[in-house]
């Protein structure tokens, strides 16, 4: 979300390819790149971290810090994350794909579940596309372009298949960092055979707040609730979405 994102992306890739990091850092980065983008692996890693927490004081500081961050409770996988179609409640206004992501599916399944319920109540048919998964942001930010492009290409192919089939009005994303990355797929795939499809997918990508502003949020209760709102950098700078979340909360 820096002012010169394309230059930063090139720099990350160049550093990854040309700078020889200390061996421990290389192992850590390679391990994270093979775990975080895969929800089942990430879930297994978190469960393992809980088991070894008593041994944390004996571990190197970097590993100890990660073990300490392991949540006490890991949610049960949601059946809603499997490829399927959820019909709209009442008249169907839009047909949208939901990006279920990767790490989020392991850390907090309620987010996708709530998003599906909200969209259906507002007249959206919600598609969880076969083959879609991690947006590629995690490895992209590490400068591991090959890995990030593999993840992104799977999403592009999955969503284009839906678009060319029964059609899509939008690709809904409820994680701002992922949304920033998907909207930038066109730049990521410049000069690639997938460039045109990547641009199409990027143009369809919408943050959940953009969709809800368009649909018009219907609330069942008018009782006042006091909340704290965190304006994510990737949302307000990366996507230039600054007022939608606050408007919806009000």
Regions from the language model: what does each represent?
Residues 6-250:
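Iron-sulfur cluster-binding electron-transfer modules in prokaryotic oxidoreductases
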Residues 2-4:
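Short, small-residue-biased leader/transition segments that mark boundaries at the very start
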């Amino acid at each position: 979300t820096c002012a010169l994102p394309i230059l930063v992306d090139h720099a990350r890739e160049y550093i990854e390819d040309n700078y020889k990091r200390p061996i421990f850092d290389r192992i850590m980065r390679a391990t994270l790149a093979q775990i975080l983008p895969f929800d089942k692996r990430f879930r297994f890693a978190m469960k393992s971290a809980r088991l070894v927490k008593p041994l944390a004081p004996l571990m190197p500081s970097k590993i100890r810090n990660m073990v300490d961050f392991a949540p006490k409770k890991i949610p049960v996988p949601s059946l809603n994350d499997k490829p399927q179609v959820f019909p709209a409640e009442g008249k169907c206004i839009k047909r949208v794909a939901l990006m279920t992501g990767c790490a989020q599916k392991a850390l907090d399944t309620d987010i996708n579940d709530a998003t599906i319920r909200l969209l259906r109540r507002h007249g959206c048919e919600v598609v969880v596309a076969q083959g879609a998964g991690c947006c590629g942001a995690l490895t992209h930010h590490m400068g591991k372009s090959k890995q990030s492009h593999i993840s992104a290409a799977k999403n592009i192919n999955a969503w284009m298949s839906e678009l060319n089939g029964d059609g899509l009005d939008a690709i809904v994303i409820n994680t701002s960092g992922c949304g920033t990355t998907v909207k930038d797929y066109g730049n990521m795939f410049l000069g690639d055979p997938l460039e045109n499809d990547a641009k199409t997918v990027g143009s369809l990508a919408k943050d959940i707040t953009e969709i809800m502003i368009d649909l018009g949020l219907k609330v069942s209760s008018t009782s006042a609730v006091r909340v704290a709102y965190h304006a994510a950098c990737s949302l307000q700078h990366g996507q230039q979405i600054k007022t939608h979340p606050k408007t919806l909360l009000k």
